[in-house]
């Protein structure tokens, strides 16, 4: 049976990114986004909160490589309340969260007061999470949870792994969740950061040791370095990831989920064929719903220190804060208050 598409409602307020004939991107804060500009979907969501992710910051600052089409509303995360639906699983009044599936990249995303989505892409927000907290988890928390699950899947355990697990970009969004999750599971965690002034924050989250990013980057450019880590959760890519792979112990596991430090990987096969190191890629965009539901249930059971992890901003301020996200100077999670 074909589902009825959602009807039109009042105008939407949000960020609108367009492109000129040369491909140059520009962003506008609009209060008059017409409903016919929102596309289609079988669930209409009144967005209450979104978050400012690295991809969103790239889009808002006109950087190429994220948006697959324009004009577009950015925002790869959205949390809010269903206003109208033809999907019986998500009746009006349901609280839902959306991450990935190309929203904010090739179809309109969550940095606007209304979002038209497909029910098959939605997750019901667990009762233990507020809508704001669900947005805080969003892509960042889900990515960290996937990375931790990858380590566990490859038999990395705190009781059999005497060496710590390294987390790069530890003071950022994904890194903060990763440090907390690993510590709560009993792992010893080495938090790697470019901002050692956040040492108290990282220790509060559960890090055993805080290490400067420059210290890792200054390690010799060798195929194999002394075995320092049983596992790695990396958000940086580039030279930093290469040094961490070279420092991973025998049978260790490295989960890579970002490229804030570069998309290249200047390493060799030596760690993989001489130490049996496993490199796992973490894709948070197109994970099946079964995986999403399982990990969201797990995240909802955790007692995250939200007051320490969240920075709240207004929707109109997203463009101003975006360069700070790209520069890596925001701590924890930037949550965007979108609507009432």
Describe every region a protein language model picked out:
Residues 10, 292-340:
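C-terminal hydrophobic helical "lid"/dimerization subdomain
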Residues 36-51, 63-103:
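Glycine-rich beta-strand-centered segment in the early N-terminal region that forms part
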Residues 216-227:
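Short amphipathic alpha-helix with an adjacent loop that forms part of the alpha/beta core around
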Residues 77, 94-95, 114, 184, ...:
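Residue-level marker of beta-strand positions
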Residues 99-165:
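NAD(P)H dinucleotide-binding glycine-rich loop of Rossmann-like/cofactor-binding domains
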Residues 239-304, 339-340:
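Glycine-rich phosphate-binding loop and adjacent beta-alpha segment
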Residues 135-213:
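Mid-domain Rossmann-like dinucleotide-binding core that forms the NAD(H)/NADP(H) cofactor-binding site
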Residues 97, 230-233, 255:
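N-terminal Rossmann-like NAD(P) cofactor-binding module of classical short-chain dehydrogenase/reductase
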